[in-house]
Design a protein with these regions (language model features):
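Acidic/glycine-enriched connector segments
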Residues: 1-159
Length: 159
């Protein structure tokens, strides 16, 4: 089976969630319809991550649920994960703990992000500012010559 891997990164706080939601629905729907199997790699550290996971679940329910995996990639195990592991396992198709777990917690996020980029055929960003972890990850994806989309650019064009 041919697996197409997509990872998502964006700012923690989002000003226009409805426009991003629509763009995510279009992109995820297109991927589900056109690819044999899609692995969606996500985090869970802010509003963009929540929008992405909601869009993945919605599109899988409405379009196709037999050719994808919704994978939460954690940089390390948290107390919250331990306390609610059963709930998280019910929400995501798979949960991975990145091998960055032994690093300092701030460095672990960037190590996890780079691992996700390295695995991806497509990297989707929502980066409006030239600062923060999502921006650093976008710079890394560009350096690695990864195919990427910055949804902030496409939303800016439609204003």
């Amino acid at each position: 089976m041919d697996t197409y891997t997509v990872s998502f990164f964006g700012h923690r706080y989002i000003d226009n969630p409805l426009a991003i939601d629509a763009a995510l629905d279009d992109l995820i729907g297109t991927l589900l319809r056109s690819k044999e199997y899609v692995e969606f790699l996500v985090g869970r550290n802010g509003e963009f991550d929540q929008l992405v996971s909601s869009a993945i679940r919605r599109c899988k329910r409405e379009i196709r649920d037999n050719n994808s995996a919704h994978v939460w990639v954690l940089p390390y195990v948290t107390a919250d994960f331990r306390d609610y592991e059963d709930d998280y396992r019910a929400y995501y198709d798979e949960i991975e703990i990145c091998n960055s777990a032994g690093r300092h917690y701030k460095a672990a996020f960037q190590a996890r992000n780079r691992n996700m980029v390295d695995r991806s055929d497509l990297v989707v960003f929502f980066v409006e500012r030239q600062e923060g972890g999502a921006y650093q990850t976008m710079r890394y994806a560009i350096q690695q010559d990864k195919q990427f989309i910055n949804l902030a650019d496409s939303l800016e064009e439609h204003k």
